[in-house]
A protein has these predicted regions:
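N-terminal cap/lid segment of alpha/beta-hydrolase-fold proteins
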Residues: 3-22
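Conserved catalytic-core motifs of eukaryotic protein kinase domains, centered on the activation segment
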Residues: 48-50, 73-79, 139-142, 248-249
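Conserved alpha/beta-hydrolase catalytic His-Asp/Glu region
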Residues: 161-227
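Active-site loop/oxyanion-hole signature of alpha/beta-hydrolase fold enzymes
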Residues: 26, 64-109, 113, 120, ...
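Conserved loop-alpha-helix segment in the C-terminal half of the alpha/beta-hydrolase fold
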Residues: 225-270
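Catalytic active-site module of serine/aspartate enzymes centered on a nucleophile-bearing elbow/loop
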Residues: 260-295
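Flexible "cap/lid" loop of the alpha/beta hydrolase fold
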Residues: 119, 126-165
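Conserved HGGG/HGGXW glycine-rich cap/lid loop of the alpha/beta-hydrolase fold
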Residues: 19-72
């Protein structure tokens, strides 16, 4: 199935925010339902959730959006890109859309942003899903090498024109090898089109500076960490057996630091993109957790 067939039933549009300019969103579901925001990882875009937005829209008012500097949202070059700015972007987006409270789910960098948002704007949160989230300690040598590898693969896609193969290599890092068949030409070419835009290339060194810093440090850590002990909301660590950087033991070590935490490990073999690699299982877990607090 193509991305646009997956998006049938969703509205793709742009909204203006005070500090972050034009933001691309994908929206589905009834607006009187509980809101659910979906956030992608570093270098990502709303297509990461193409398989989830419409199905989850049967239960929630779903909004996925491109971070500033990402996807087809505005590319600002007059700011730095710590993870905290994406939390502020989410707050402004909620304000513009007239949404007072929402469930928040983020993958990778989006998971880190979820944790930062929950601490900074607790009154705006319902339940949280930290999906293969960044912002927790890396505890293995393999995890540190995974981070260095990600930075290296990313660097091949800016500063010079990206290619189909350079994009494909970076996207293969995201997905468990047994699921590489899910990387369609359409998905790879969609990211290639985004990364080839002059505004993206101009902004990329700022967006990816956090990866470059991590590589220089040997992959020992990333800038910005979640203050898990300060998260008051119910939070689900949604993990996979083949997650790069942070393996299951890293999630298990983070779990006791959450006051109201749960851990779910995907039954299907997945890498860093469980929402794309096993959407039916992912969506079922999300719906059950956000409606009942159980997994």
């Amino acid at each position: 199935m193509s991305i646009w067939l997956d998006f049938l039933g969703a509205e793709i549009r742009y909204v203006e925010t005070p500090s972050f300019g034009r933001v691309r969103i994908a929206e589905a579901g009834r607006r009187n339902a509980e809101a659910l925001f979906l956030m992608h990882g570093i270098g990502g875009h709303i297509e990461a959730y193409s398989k989830n937005i419409v199905p989850l829209g049967e239960h929630f008012h779903v909004i996925a959006f491109d971070f500033v500097g990402h996807g087809l949202s505005e590319k600002k070059t007059d700011i730095e890109y710590p993870a905290s700015i994406y939390a502020d972007q989410l707050k402004e987006l909620m304000d513009v859309l007239g949404i007072e409270k929402a469930h928040i789910s983020g993958e990778s960098l989006g998971g880190l942003v979820t944790g930062l948002f929950a601490v900074k704007y607790p009154e705006r949160c319902l339940r949280l899903i930290l999906n293969t989230a960044g912002g927790i300690p890396i505890i293995t040598d393999k995890g540190r090498q995974d981070l260095v590898d990600l930075a290296t693969l990313t660097e091949k896609n800016y500063g010079k024109p990206p290619s189909y193969d350079s994009i494909k290599g970076r996207m293969q890092w995201l997905i468990y090898e047994g699921n590489w068949g899910l990387l369609t030409d359409e998905l790879i070419n969609s990211r290639l089109a985004i990364y080839s835009r002059p505004d993206f290339q101009k902004c990329a060194p700022l967006v990816f500076a956090r990866l470059s810093q991590a590589k220089e440090g040997g992959g020992k850590s990333m800038p910005d960490m979640m203050e898990l002990e300060k998260i008051e909301q119910e939070a689900l660590l949604l993990w996979t057996t083949h997650n790069p950087i942070h393996d299951v033991p890293a999630a298990e070590a983070a779990l006791p630091r959450l006051k109201h935490g749960k851990l779910y490990v995907m039954q299907k073999e997945c890498g860093h993109w469980p929402q794309y690699e096993s959407p039916e299982e992912f969506d079922a877990v999300v719906v059950k957790y956000l409606t009942t607090g159980e997994v």
